[in-house]
C-alpha cells in the first residue's frame, strides 16, 4: 500500500466510486460471478445471507477467510466483508486478507456493547449502518467512509429502510436550516459530534455516500430507495433467496440505474418468479431486531 492509501480522502473517494450501483451479498464464487455478470458494482462475501443468519439464530461471526479469498479470486469488482461491531481482530484479519471494504455490521452478533471500532486506525475503508443523523454522524466521526440504512436485514420488508432513509434526510434538512450557534444544542440532543454536524450543514448533505440496505427484495424496492435519496443499494437476501437469482440480480441493477423509468421497471418485474419470503416487522421479538444493534 502507498502512503496515501487509507487517508480519509482516498477512502471516501473509493466509496464514491460505487455511487449509483448495487452491492450484492454472496456466499461463494459462483454467486459472486452471477452478481458481477448482472452488473453489481461490488459484492459482500459472507458465510450466510441475513435471512439464513436470522433463521439460524445463535452467534453470528466473521466469515471463514477461505470464503472471502474464494470470492476475491472469482471476480474483478470490489469485495467487501463483514466484521462484528467492535471486534478489533476480525477487522484486522479482513484487512490482512486485502478486502476492499469492511462492513462493521449489525447483521453479525456485536462483540462489544460499548464501543464501535475506531475506523481511522485502518487503511481499508469501512461501511456502517445508521437509522438517524446521530448514528450517521457518530460513525462518520469514527472514520466510516460509507453509510447505509440499517433497515431490518433478512426480512424482505422495505419499510424500515424507508423509515431510516427518510429520517436521515429529514434531519439533514433540519441541520442545514439551523444557525451555527444552534448546532451545539442539536449535537447534545442527538449525540452527533458537533464538527460532523458543521460539515453536514455546510455541504447540505452527508460527507459520505449513504446507500439503502435492509429489506430490498424487488426492482421496485430498489427504485423506491433511489427516489428517496439513496446513493446506491445493498441487496442481502433478496437476490439468492428469490426464485430466479440471475433475473432478479439483473432486474434490480437495471431498476437502480433507471429508477424513474416506470415502464422499464414494469417490464423488468414481469415473470421474475417469486421474490424472497418476507417477514412482517411487527412479528419480530425485540431481540430479533438487528437494527437495534449499535449505538
UniProtKB/Swiss-Prot annotation:
Q: Name one Pfam family in it.
A: SOR_SNZ
Example of a GO MF term:
pyridoxal 5'-phosphate synthase (glutamine hydrolysing) activity
Residues annotated as signal peptide: none
- Active-site positions, per UniProt? 82
What does the entry list as the binding residues for D-glyceraldehyde 3-phosphate?
166
- CDD domains hit by this protein: pdxS
GO BP, sorted A to Z? amino acid metabolic process; pyridoxal phosphate biosynthetic process; pyridoxine biosynthetic process
Main enzyme class: lyase
> Gene3D superfamilies given for it?
Aldolase class I
Write the Enzyme Commission number(s) for this entry. Answer: 4.3.3.6
- Record's PROSITE patterns? PDXS_SNZ_1, PDXS_SNZ_2
Similarity comment text for this entry: Belongs to the PdxS/SNZ family.
Cited PANTHER family = PYRIDOXAL 5'-PHOSPHATE SYNTHASE SUBUNIT SNZ1-RELATED
By what name is this protein known? Pyridoxal 5'-phosphate synthase subunit PdxS
Amino acid at each position: 500500500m502507498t502512503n496515501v492509501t487509507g487517508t480519509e480522502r482516498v477512502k471516501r473517494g473509493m466509496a464514491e466510486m460505487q455511487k449509483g450501483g448495487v452491492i450484492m451479498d454472496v456466499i461463494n464464487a459462483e454467486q459472486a460471478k452471477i452478481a458481477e455478470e448482472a452488473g453489481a458494482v461490488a459484492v459482500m462475501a459472507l458465510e450466510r445471507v441475513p435471512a439464513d443468519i436470522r433463521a439460524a439464530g445463535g452467534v453470528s461471526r466473521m466469515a471463514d477467510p477461505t470464503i472471502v479469498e474464494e470470492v476475491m479470486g472469482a471476480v474483478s469488482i470490489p469485495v467487501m466483508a463483514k466484521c462484528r461491531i467492535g471486534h478489533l481482530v476480525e477487522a484486522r484479519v479482513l484487512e490482512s486478507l486485502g478486502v476492499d471494504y469492511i462492513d462493521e455490521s449489525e447483521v453479525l452478533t456485536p462483540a462489544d456493547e460499548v464501543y464501535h471500532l475506531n475506523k481511522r486506525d485502518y487503511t481499508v475503508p469501512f461501511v456502517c449502518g445508521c437509522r438517524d443523523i446521530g448514528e450517521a454522524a457518530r460513525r462518520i466521526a469514527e472514520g466510516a467512509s460509507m453509510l447505509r440504512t440499517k433497515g431490518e436485514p433478512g426480512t424482505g420488508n422495505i419499510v424500515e429502510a424507508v423509515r431510516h432513509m427518510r429520517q436521515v434526510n429529514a434531519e439533514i434538512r433540519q441541520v442545514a436550516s439551523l444557525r451555527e450557534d444552534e448546532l451545539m444544542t442539536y449535537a447534545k440532543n442527538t449525540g452527533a459530534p458537533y464538527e460532523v454536524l458543521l460539515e453536514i450543514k455546510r455541504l447540505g448533505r452527508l460527507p459520505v455516500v449513504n446507500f439503502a440496505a435492509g429489506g430490498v427484495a424487488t426492482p421496485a424496492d430498489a427504485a423506491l430507495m433511489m427516489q428517496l435519496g439513496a446513493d446506491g443499494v445493498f441487496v442481502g437476501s433478496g437476490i439468492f433467496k428469490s426464485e430466479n437469482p440471475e433475473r432478479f440480480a439483473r432486474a434490480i441493477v437495471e431498476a437502480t440505474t433507471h429508477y424513474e423509468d416506470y415502464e422499464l421497471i414494469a417490464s423488468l418485474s414481469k415473470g421474475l418468479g417469486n421474490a424472497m419470503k418476507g417477514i412482517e416487522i411487527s412479528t419480530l421479538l425485540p431481540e430479533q431486531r438487528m437494527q437495534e444493534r449499535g449505538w
